[in-house]
Amino acid sequence: MVDLKQTQRVIITAGGSGIGEAIAESFLNKGSKVHICDINEKTLNGCLQKHKGLRGSVTDIGNSTDVENLISEALDWMGGVDVLINNAGIGGPNSNLEDISYKDWNRTISVNLNGMFYCIKNIAKTMKDQKSGCIINISTASAKVALPGRSPYVASKVGVLGLTHTVAREYGPYGIRCNAILPGLINNERGRGILSNHAKEKNIDFEEAEKNFLKYISLRTWIDPSEVGELAVFLASSAGRHITGQQIGMDGNVEWEI
């Protein structure tokens, strides 16, 4: 079991559901103060009601002004920030590259990559003044193996890795660490939806679609969202104090994606 030696002050983007909610729950279970955001007010409020002590803001991570307000609101009640989890992301269009609109490309990059820059930019001074901080960026296993038809998504998530490595070098002298987690096939509504869409496209049942995906994962396994939460807690703990600049797969070793 990983114990946090002190009450961590944590900001998690897109924390209202899915992986973000699982990460929030993991930190709450360790006694952390947690501030989340979500673009959907109904989703956000439902999560806040579900988890005692959780606070949050309605935020479009692709909007720099929204992000400035998010960080300001979180810092006002927490008094600082020890951990930033950049989890917000969208799947973007599913299409051949030549058919992707400029609008869809720009929106995907804006949320998935620019949003992380906005968040890091707005907490950097606070962490520098503290001489400590942990930043965790959520990328994807697709960043390693590519994914035809999803070029904006993959490009944005590869960009996340470059940002992660650069932040680790640039801010390491100030005691700030930065790592990326690369999840695989997540066993939640979104992950199952991906398989359902694949099944419809191929005119096969869900079980056959599942076999098609799992055969390219060495451990033949789904990933539970709570596992990503547990890894994030580990990286933010004293046990992870010398881990920085790393891209860590939580994917059962994805060999290929279809």
Model-found features: residue ranges?
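Active-site helix of classical SDR
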Residues: 120, 156, 164
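Conserved glycine-rich cofactor-binding loop
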Residues: 16-18
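C-terminal helical subdomain
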Residues: 180, 188, 204-239, 243, ...
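Residue(s) in the substrate-gating loop at a strand-loop-helix junction
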Residues: 140
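Substrate-binding pocket helix/loop in short-chain dehydrogenase/reductase
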Residues: 95-97, 101-109, 135, 213
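Short C-terminal tail/terminal secondary-structure segment
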Residues: 4, 91-94, 145, 221, ...
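Short, small/polar-rich loop/turn modules that mediate ligand/substrate recognition or access, typified
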Residues: 172, 177, 243-245
